[in-house]
């Protein structure tokens, strides 16, 4: 006897925007209240200061600073949003997601979203935020990607390798 499959409704939204603009801002406006609650749930003092976030970006990913600054501006120059958008010192969250790579003449990358569906943004983004290469992927945290592929065909998938 087999177990019946559970079907969960899922709605995906997609946007295409070469640089952050009104479509990203609409995503921000729709999701920021929930992200703000999550980001500040342990108190704002438990999150890094804005200067620390900026220094971390400058040290680790300086090429992202112009995009981050544009996103911050679109977020109304809200310092709390700027801190969260830096993705530095985020609150702890469960890690997961399964993936499989099938090598061969036509390699295949398969990725599963193993989190609670309520945590899934359900957004597919097509962007060129770097100004160097178009990217299509599953968006998370407003401007990060869980997985995706660039215009040259390089596919990537986020995994934590079994480590929290």
Residue ranges of each PLM-predicted region?
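N-terminal mature-domain region immediately after signal-peptide cleavage
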Residues: 1-164
């Amino acid at each position: 006897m087999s177990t019946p499959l559970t079907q969960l409704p899922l709605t995906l939204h997609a946007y295409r925007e070469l640089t952050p603009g009104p479509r990203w801002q609409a995503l921000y406006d729709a999701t920021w209240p929930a992200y703000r609650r999550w980001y500040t749930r342990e108190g704002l003092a438990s999150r890094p200061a804005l200067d620390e976030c900026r220094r971390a970006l400058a040290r680790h990913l300086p090429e992202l600073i112009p995009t981050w600054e544009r996103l911050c501006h679109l977020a109304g120059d809200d310092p709390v949003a700027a801190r969260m958008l830096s993705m530095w010192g985020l609150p702890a969250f469960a890690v997961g997601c399964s993936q499989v790579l099938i090598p061969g003449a036509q390699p295949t990358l398969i990725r599963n979203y193993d989190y609670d569906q309520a945590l899934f943004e359900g957004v597919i983004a097509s962007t060129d935020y770097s100004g160097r290469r178009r990217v299509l992927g599953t968006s998370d945290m407003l401007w990060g990607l869980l997985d995706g592929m660039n215009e040259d065909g390089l596919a990537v998938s986020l995994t934590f390798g079994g480590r929290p």
